[in-house]
Amino acid sequence: MLFPSISDTDEITRITLTRPTIGDDLPDVLGVFALSSADGMDDLPKQSPRPTPLLVEHSEDVFLRPGIRGQRVSVDSLGSLLAGTAWSPRFVVSNTFGDEDHLTIDAKDDDAQLALRTELETLKGGTLRVRHTLTNTGDSEYLLDALNVHVPLSDDLTEIMDFTGRHEHERDPQRRAIADGTWLRECRYGRPGFEGQIMVAGTPGFDFGHGRVMLVQLAWSGNSTLEVDRNSSDEAGINAGELLSPSEVTLGKDESYSTPWVMITASNAGLDGISASLHTWQRSLPEHPAKQPVILNVWEGVMFDHNLDRLLEIARRAARIGVERYVLDDGWFHLRRDDHAGLGDWWVDPDVWPEGLTPLVDAVHKLGMEFGLWFEPEMVNPDSDFYRE
């Protein structure tokens, strides 16, 4: 089975699966490709040396890191905790449906009392996105530790690139050859870090314009895990999913958990090819046609010194040179006279703005500009009412 069907002559990511048949095991992924033309089916890149499903299961004799890790827990008649069951499910296909751009595979393990839905969708520009949804169909709770999408690597993709970094040194690429074992990148900030949630595998020496490459990226703003796993049998792949804390996801009867969407993009023309694919999709979104305004942020101009007359003069000058959105930055909220206090108290400080922000907002609007307001909701100062309360 080839999914999705050919619909564009540009370079498109393809995923080839064994046919998902009712009652069979999860379909194997035979290869993930980027075609330089719609007629390129006879010249596909190499496939994985051994096909693996989009969810790694040890019950299928694929001894990479399992894609689902968890166990069922219950209490017996004496009140003792029973755990350690349903930790290695074997899913069989129960239903499939889809169209040219979508494929959904439902599977279940009646013994483990778990149901799995895998969704695949092709996006404009060639990017493919995949996610799993796990449902507990049993009466006892299921403690889920991990649920990851597995993307197999063909044996010519032997080099990986990911990113590290820090403030003012963001997105520093680091490269290495794939070796037996696991290369693990975890983000524990509760948000994407400077290193991002990206893993690229490619032919040796790939660069912006050359080489066959495949990108795996999580469309997710929380904790994440990306791992490249290869065993001594030359089975290799990238696993991607949310990094779950202990007992963070405990599924009661009929409760479900969905992974973030995992984006898969491939190119036969280096990193620029995968960038072009993602950009094409982003430009197709309903929000994209909106005009991006010219923005002035007043931070460097006034810092914490919020003086209405000065800010109004900046607004008048901004309007004269064509600024379309005027943004008031740090310093407008409670206690915020320097960077040691106030974060978390997101209300207008009456000592600085006795009439509120209305005079400035009205003036900006009369000058024909939008008004924007800066705040940093993920941060807090110990010297704030929010923190003390």
Language-model features: locations:
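Polysaccharide-binding surfaces and accessory modules of carbohydrate-active proteins
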Residues: M1-D229, S245
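Short coil/turn motifs at secondary-structure junctions
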Residues: L123, T137-D139, A266-S267, E378-V380
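Acidic/glycine-rich phosphate/pyrophosphate-binding loops and surrounding catalytic core
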Residues: V213, L218-L226, M263-W281
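Short acidic, Pro/Gly- and aromatic-enriched capping/linker segments at domain boundaries
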Residues: S232-G252
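Glycine-rich, acidic/polar active-site loops that bind/position phosphate-bearing ligands
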Residues: P246-L251, A269, I321, E370
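Short Pro-Gly-centered flexible turn/kink motifs
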Residues: V249-N268
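Long, charged amphipathic helices and adjacent flexible linkers at domain junctions
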Residues: S277-P289, V294
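Aromatic-lined carbohydrate-binding/catalytic grooves of carbohydrate-active enzymes
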Residues: P289-E389
